[in-house]
Amino acid sequence: MQENRYSRHELLREVGIEGQKRISQGRVLIIGAGGLGSPASLYLASSGVKKITIVDSDTVDLTNLQRQVIHNMERLGMNKAESAKAALQAINPEVEIISVDHRPGLEELENLVSECDVALDCTDNTDSRYVFNDVCRRLKKPLVTAGVVAFDGQITVFDFRDPDSACYACLFPNHEGKDEKASTKGVFAPLVGMLGCMQAAEALKIIGKFGEPLTGRLLMVDARTMTWRQMKYRRDDECPCCSQGK
């Protein structure tokens, strides 16, 4: 085998040359260029996906640098999507990077989702999660979602190509008052790195068509003890988002 940038992927029996070719044609949409979006986008770019669209309306703040490893001191005050684009282009100029420096309206979000093969929810806003979930569901796009607060993290995959897939609202039906942000609760820096890398792994498995994605399983970790738990779930027939007739 001729050595190339992606040779170590191609050596994996489950991936191989064909799997890497599929990865190189993959288009990924990432909402959020913060703690989760940083490692997720870095590994997707280094793995050679075709296109990454990264959305964030926030600017880089000094307190972000504790965990948002895609940004640096030189880009303080810069829009996070633009900062991420600069870093990703430096890592792999073969990848097309599109930055969206504002919060898209519903129509624009639908257009962004329609143009991707897999979407990553890397936000810290509950309302945004529900909207993103609903758009991905309607457009039948796989959604990899993760969240971290303090020392607790979780990740799962909703594969909306399956008409019987559960959705975010099935798993978390009540969301009033549940936003817990790093600015108030704190966050253990390495944990967002772990979960963001796992989001990239799930996206690559979906695009490359290998392995078993985390569909129907919520993986949870307590980083204080590094204890992992898994909870299986299924579609809720009473879900206001995805139940029949809705």
Identify the residue ranges that each predicted region occupies:
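Adenine nucleotide-associated cytosolic modules
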Residues: 1-246
